[in-house]
């Protein structure tokens, strides 16, 4: 259904009988050169999970920033319990009962669990000092309600992503949030961790919370959400009940077309060996790994969480050092002690957590894209802005980067466009080997097909690619061969003709 019909019914056709907790009516957000949101109306109801679906750049992130008080819309109004409100700051949104749990949780490693939960609203004694005993006790009660035995007095620095999400949810409960926004919460979770998260979400529903669930994973959307809203090009183009709407229809709403070939793999005539790894071992994470990567080949690496896939990739890039083993690049033995060594050798790495490890978020797009290539854009120690812009523009156009300008901070981009910046900055160095760690994590279905197509193009041009992925369709659809890892060991290398979900899962789990 199209936007006009949706706008008329968005606030009164939702599933629940209860009035909406929060409504957005006619919201528009305008930035220089782009209308990020165009006359958007949505309603969130108590005890209901509403999935917000759309391609990267569709306006989802802008909507979340408005709801959390980071942006103030140019047009439209927000109502809470039927009363107009203005979120002039993040604190104003929190005071109104709105909280967000992001894909990369905003928590502080050096603070304890309890301190993170009650940051900014810690219980006080009569003397107005922090009541540490009460804070730890309340944090423990919140965690127990979430069926967690996490010690609230320990620091967060060694916590897994799943544990961080749990702390973020406990924080939401501590401020008595009524509207909970979950932005790609399952992106780095195992299936068991996803099941645990969904159990908590269902508990929040029972407590009457209104939940806005943002995800690109349709199986999870259909599992946990009741309703959906689809964004495209800054507009809300469709809404309804998930159980009444086929997935293909939602995809058509998202992209305005049918997406037929999600894995546009190109057959490539491989060249000779480019990277050879022999008996590579790490002190704790992986042991005795060997493989050969040929020119133009896409080598997939698959395994369960904790199998050592990312750790192996990071070691190849020099983030960590191997305990033993040999690395050969184009027939010559090399030693990689640091990422700088790897870059000089022609090996680059696109990390899983792009926001934390791949980008300088406050810096402009063009500077992020040219950081590893400063020797090409400087003369006698002085940077040449025109050359920086020209280099950044070249790869921005090649990757179809969607941004108002190359001078805007990269942190203002959607997740998919941020990923394009990371890939572009490494392509600008003319590498021989590129390692892609979860390259489509947090990317929508339409953009995934585009990224897959670009990966295939790079392979056809002779670039050698290592692709780490936890998504079986991606591994099978894009790889020429697959190295399966299990508990730090190589469980097998499969040729393309041998690839099947059953074979890879059996190898990854040890159930031969």
Swiss-Prot record:
Q: Which InterPro entries match?
A: AAA+_ATPase, ABC_carbohydrate_import_ATPase, ABC_transporter-like_ATP-bd, ABC_transporter-like_CS, P-loop_NTPase
One of this protein's Pfam families, by short name?
ABC_tran
Which reactions are catalysed by this chain? Answer: D-ribose(out) + ATP + H2O = D-ribose(in) + ADP + phosphate + H(+)
What's an example of a GO molecular-function annotation for this chain? ATP hydrolysis activity
Q: Which UniProt keywords apply?
A: ATP-binding, Cell inner membrane, Cell membrane, Membrane, Nucleotide-binding, Plasmid, Repeat, Sugar transport, Translocase, Transport
Cellular compartment(s):
Cell inner membrane
CDD domains per record: ABC_Carb_Monos_I, ABC_Carb_Monos_II
Membrane topology note = Peripheral membrane protein
Recorded GO cellular component terms are: plasma membrane
Q: Which EC number(s) does the record attach to this protein?
A: 7.5.2.7
Residues reported to bind ATP: 54-61
**Which coarse location class applies to the principal site listed for this UniProt protein?**
membrane
Q: Which residues form the ABC transporter domain?
A: 22-258, 263-512
Function text:
Part of the ABC transporter complex RbsABC involved in ribose import. Responsible for energy coupling to the transport system.
Assembly and oligomerization: The complex is composed of an ATP-binding protein (RbsA), two transmembrane proteins (RbsC) and a solute-binding protein (RbsB).
Family to which this protein belongs: Belongs to the ABC transporter superfamily. Ribose importer (TC 3.A.1.2.1) family.
Q: What is this protein called?
A: Ribose import ATP-binding protein RbsA 2
